[in-house]
Amino acid sequence: MNITQILSQELSATAAQITAAVELLDDGATVPFIARYRKEATGGLDDTQLRRLAERLQYLRELEERKAVVLKSIEEQGKLSDDLRAQIEAADNKTALEDLYLPYKPKRRTKAQIAREHGLQPLADVLLAEQSQDVEAAAQGYLNENVPDAKAALDGARAILMEQFAEDAELIGTLRDKLWNEAEIHAQVVGGKETEGEKFSDYFDHREPIRAMPSHRALAVLRGRNEGVLNIALKYQPDDTPITQQSEYEQIIARRFKVSDGHKWLRDTVRLTWRAKIFLSLELEALNRLKEAADTDAITVFARNLKDLLLAAPAGRLTTLGLDPGYRNGVKCAVVDDTGKLLDTVIVYLHQENNMLATLSRLIKQHGVKLIAIGNGTASRETDKIAGELVREMSKMGLHKIVVSEAGASIYSASELAAREFPDLDVSLRGAVSIARRLQDPLAELVKIDPKSIGVGQYQHDVNQSQLAKSLDAVVEDCVNAVGVDVNTASAPLLARISGLNQTLAQNIVAYRDENGAFDSRKKLLKVPRLGEKTFEQAAGFLRINGGKEPLDASAVHPEAYPVVAKMLAQQGISAAELIGNRERVKQIKASDFTDERFGLPTILDILSELEKPGRDPRGEFQTASFAEGIHEISDLQVGMILEGVVSNVANFGAFVDIGVHQDGLVHISALSNKFVQDPREVVKAGDVVKVKVLEVDAARKRIALTMRLDDEPGGAKHKMPSENRSRERTAGRKPQRNDRAPANSAMADAFAKLKR
């Protein structure tokens, strides 16, 4: 199959859809642009499908390039048969291709090559083909100045056969698949590391099938190995198997080369090939495969959580007081207006409560503050308590206080971007500005921070960093373009994420705006230096201009489709202002009346949807959690308490919930609902406000077990996974050990815990 056919099969799309999408991508179109404005061409492929297509397209093209290199190399050696060419051209992955290339791949002189140079290839061939003869006698005919005795001859012949066995592509493929499907990974504590590595205690003697090991356990075990606490190995047969007993893998090798059961020398050669050569290579390969799969899974989790946070509902354009709590260095305070512009800053101290109340009260009255955003770090609860007093005392002001995640705020405050924005503002106060702004509009503020610093990733520092960065960049790009931005108020970092734009163009837009005033039309963007027609095509639909000359500029209708809207207006006999936002009028328009060769039904329906509700925001309604009074630390928790919290992170095994005690609790997947849950994201997402019951508290190990099944009783049956969940574990091939899995809601191992960074 060619690349188009492969992608068509993998994405369940037609060849025409794939061809169109590939042509658009090759022409420089972005995924958001294609997904939104080229639905006719791609048959409606969404951004997720297009991202997958782009990723696989790159892989398959690299595979084709590698095939060409391999074919050329083997052909130059004069060893390229028609059968081998066909096998190489049929290889559908890089591993299979490299297996085929291995016997022909230039390599440093091996023992086998030296043996061939000494004339021992015929001996190896004879020993394998004529197994009835005596090996010692056969070796006598191959002695020379480089091969002084029979032992040297047989050692050379063995090296040749071992290399021959180990480079058989079909055999290696069979052994690889068998090992992956049947072997267990075994983790054991390194002697003397029990105390130092206590956080990995769940893995001090842990076994489970490698193919079924979930990403969080795989990454925990691999981290334990990297920190020198755990030894890990692959086990392919019971530990008590006699060392002389032939394994199933050795039997497969023997059958492949027709080695008879009674030929000890050849049997020993097979055993050595497997144990000293093939297994060691496949074990390393399997562990790498486990790591890659775990990385992919963890990155997917991170990306989903990031998307949920970026698309969290904004509190809106209200003057906001941001509080960055602290004890010794005080509570840093910053007031921003409804556009996010900094108005005032001050530092107050918790131990000077009266002064703090008076100062904050003055700020609130002076600037007409409507929202108080409180960072959720150190001293958050004490700061929240004082903010609560202000809300009560100033009830006529219509104040609201909200605790928000401050993850990444300190990194932003020390960044070059923050320094450019606030060159004269103390670094410590910049974080308070970020906290205030992220309440007003999470997306606009969080794009300024490295996604890895937002604190919603599972083992984000353990996974492939380039793959992680690529995935997260795609998420940010998709989120920003899904919402769209106001070109007259957006920051350069936000504009840089728009389809077709980059940092340079974003800065040029801001500079042009600062010098010439607000843009009054999308067309004016073409006056920005280096912003040409192609870039305009990619970006214009995602850039909004409110209150401009053209009402459609405030919508997601692309300028290329304005003539279509003009036809609609002419048919209805009304102006754009009369149609936009007028649901009844829009409903009177028949979409099929306006389709043509360029604009099909999907685009016309999108236009009508946008006209009905222009500039619609895909983000939900703003909501907040109310943390319980008097619950500030983990020591304040009692089993049985029912609390309100915010989902901070969703993993494959459950959801972490911030209940205001500086340590997130875990709702295991089995405690998310009374119904069977396949994926935690079916029930919750990052940012959701939920009610939970405390099931277990281990203050020493900082573990909090929670449940969303509020009728669960601590110590009762809920500490066992529901039978349906156990069934799922079995069907997935998992074999969790008792020392690996604590009761279903015991907050899991520290190694599973989200690291808030």
Curated annotation (Swiss-Prot):
Domain of life: Bacteria
Biased composition (Basic and acidic residues): 710-741
CDD domains: S1_Tex
Pfam families: HHH_3, HHH_9, S1, Tex_central_region, Tex_N, Tex_YqgF
Cited Gene3D superfamilies: Nucleic acid-binding proteins, RuvA domain 2-like, Tex N-terminal region-like, Tex RuvX-like domain-like, YqgF/RNase H-like domain
MF annotations from Gene Ontology: mRNA binding; structural constituent of ribosome
Region (Disordered): 710-757
S1 motif domain mapped to chain residues: 640-709
Protein name: Uncharacterized protein NMA0194
Species of origin: Neisseria meningitidis serogroup A / serotype 4A (strain DSM 15465 / Z2491)
